[in-house]
């Protein structure tokens, strides 16, 4: 294993930031980089990747193609990711060739729900109760009544790899439906609402956090984020402090998303960590001095972090599936429309988002 390369100097305008992954996050990162005079080179295994439409250079190859990854790295000054499920071998290879952030340790933690929860708890931060499940009988024994959620330890997002269960036998059957894939059984949290913190840490250790939004989900997919969330100033500060402790413990560089449950008693529980720009931070494009996408590029390119101050209240709503077909109405509803350039509309697929802003009314 090669030692990870460290960025010795900021990437100057005209330089190239490599982005592994070509989805909408890579697309918006590329647009933000261009505003700073930086080029992006996008690597994706999908010929119709949305980010290919807006980048300066592209590589179409598999994430297990070592030769293609090496050529990609040679063309970049720094490298980052737009999704967390990067194959470990690819992350290791790239980090030994060019400065690559977030680091491999952060990716490894975020790729495994069990490791993630153990990591967060070791920092003294609360999570939902959970137990590892390696076989059906583990699920049966771990079920403690009420409701619980069985989740695969790896490769879960937007509700994939999850089943809500209401009995020990149902938990066991759910595990069997996962075909023996390692899982965790998580106690169901009767939360008041969900929130998140999108924050950034720079190469110099500087930290900046955005105001937490309230997040509403439908069918396990984020539907809307509203800022400010109905949190007290103390809760908002606590949420940002949680994100900072996690980022510092990971020696993290880049933007990170920390998803939270807010219980009815006001307690904050960490649900998941996303080592990348986050869907619940899209509102920052219109409502903040520095968007999460510019902030991430600044961090991984070794630039000073920008100002995360929110100058407006915001409501961000995802455009999902067939809703994108009504683009005429979406383009005239008074919001800032972002369509991702995806070639095919599919049920449950995020096709874009709209953000509405209004005068700022709250502190957090």
Give residue spans per PLM region.
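Active-site nucleotide/adenylate-binding loops and adjacent lid/helix of ATP-dependent enzymes
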Residues: 109-196, 200-246, 358-359
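Short, low-complexity Ser/Thr-rich regulatory SLiMs
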Residues: 199-203, 260-264, 341
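Active-site "cap" helix and flanking loop/linker of ATP-utilizing ligase/carboxylase catalytic domains
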Residues: 237-258, 264, 274-322
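Peripheral (often C-terminal) accessory segments that flank ATP-dependent C-N-forming ligase machineries
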Residues: 5, 13, 298-364
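Short, flexible active-site loops
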Residues: 220-230, 272-285
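Protein kinase-like catalytic core scaffold
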Residues: 208, 256, 268-272
